[in-house]
Every structure is written in structure tokens, then in C-alpha cells.
Amino acid sequence: MRTIDIHAHLVPRSMWNAFDAKKDWYGFHFEPGPGAGYVNGGGAHNHLTSPKVKFTPEERLKDMDAQGVDIQVLSIHTPFFGYHLDKKEGQALARDVNQEIAATVRDNPKRFCGMATLPMQDVSTAIAELEHAVTKLGLKGAELDTQVN
């Protein structure tokens, strides 16, 4: 029997790369602190306690093997949907994250599958991004936050 982790959130490498360069990422700002630090944005103060939020795909695979997990369904970590952004920035965030998830899946298709994030600021933009994510990137669906606005 295969073990599938359907609750496998990903904190985008593009976010960590921006923070390493002392830049904000789509309105999110990094503050050093215990664990992996704090990320503020969208009206929220998020404490990232686990070192796993910075895992590379290779580290994620090692962790999966150690836990006996065969497949992970990757989706954006919930604080980072970016619903607080304007339509254009929300669309850019979604596209960046979806491309990162798709690249991870392409590199390890037997171990990962992916769910898109959508720019819910605008319904037609969200529909277009879902279509792109599924038909062009090969993602399996989308994850939405419980609160869009």
C-alpha cells in the first residue's frame, strides 16, 4: 500500500531567495526569530517554527523516506496565498508559485503531485490561472484558503 501525504505545504524558494537578498516578497516581509523566523504580510504575523519550511526538494524527499511517505501532494503554505495583493500582483504570485510546484513535480513525478494556488482577487483571472496550471503545468487542481477577503 502507498502512503500519500495530501497536506504537504510548500513555502516557495522564491520567497526565501527574496528574503536572503533582504527584499520583500509580494508584500511579505521577513523578521529573524526563533525557528525559521517570522513572515509578516496581508495583515498576519506568521511564526515559522519548523525548519522543514526551508526544505529543498532533495531534503523533502529524504524526510519523506524517513517517514515512509511515498507521495506528497504539494500546495502553497496557507499564510502565503497573497489575497491581500492587487489583481496583478496576486496573479504574479500565483504564477510564480505554480511554476515552482510544477518544476518540483516534473523533477520527481513518482514522488510529488501538485495543487495550484489561484489569484482569488478576480474570478476571471483565477479561472485563467487554474486552466493554465492544469493544462500547461500539469497540476491536479487548486487549493483555496477558507477566507478569500
Name every feature range the model reports, one short phrase each.
Residues 1-149:
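Helix-coil boundary/capping segments in enzymes
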